[in-house]
Amino acid sequence: GNIQKEPIAIIGMGCRYPGGVRTPEEFWHLLSSGEDILSDIPNDRWDFEAHFDPEITVPGKMYVRKGYYLDDIDQFDPQFFGLSPREAESLDPQQRLVMEVSWETLENAGIAPSSLKGGKTGVFVGQYWDDYSSQRIYSTDNREIDRYAQLSALRGLTAGRICHLLDSHGPAIQLDTACSSSSLAVHLACLSLRNGESDLALAGGVSLVLAPEHLIGICQMNALSPDGRCKTFDASADGFGQGEGCLLYTSDAA
């Protein structure tokens, strides 16, 4: 048959979304409730008032104060994943999230991660921002840059960390195609399953906004909605709302 038409089954899902959503069931409840979980930019991200001005045209400032942000992004158990506290401190929180959610999507699929050792599990991750490295690594005292800092600053290692965690011998593909990164990751995972490169695939993406510079830049483009909300296909649309999250699917050939 046509290999490009072979069906793919999504057998597991793990996620983190704003509003305290940590499971697929909580995500479904949020969608079905129609609740708006818009919130202020968390106080622990940066000095908000120093970077804010409600006037859209002010150089070097952001004009938005709200968006869709995750809670407790500093919470992580490094020992569970065999990491030292020093390495975990250097690790981009986006990589931490992907490690947690990859484990959870396998549990959701009823797969013991240890059973994948040596197998052809492919990992495909879309990741765009690199705020953590620019904020914590490249702007710090050079004497603080060690082997952990350098490795943890590389976006290209997120997928590889998961393959290392699972001892997988499948593809480890990291993608940055801006807004399409996650959808392309899923597309490539499907191709890998159909081509026989992977017996199982973890695919999705992660996004956290950890520094103000990118938001300032997007505001200077006048691309963000002043009230922080998306109004897709609506006459009142005036930009997009900045959001955060992490989603990974576990898929195999049906």
Where are these regions (language model features)?
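ACP-dependent fatty acid/polyketide chain-elongation machinery
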Residues: 1-87, 95, 103-107, 221-222, ...
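Flexible, low-complexity linker/loop segments at domain and module junctions
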Residues: 1-11, 113-119, 143, 240-246
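Structural motif
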Residues: 7-9, 121-124, 171-173, 199-201, ...
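Catalytic cores of large soluble enzymes that bind and process phosphate-bearing ligands
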Residues: 19-23, 62, 83-98, 146-154, ...
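Active-site-proximal gating segment of KS-fold condensing enzymes and close homologs
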Residues: 58-59, 66, 74, 85-93, ...
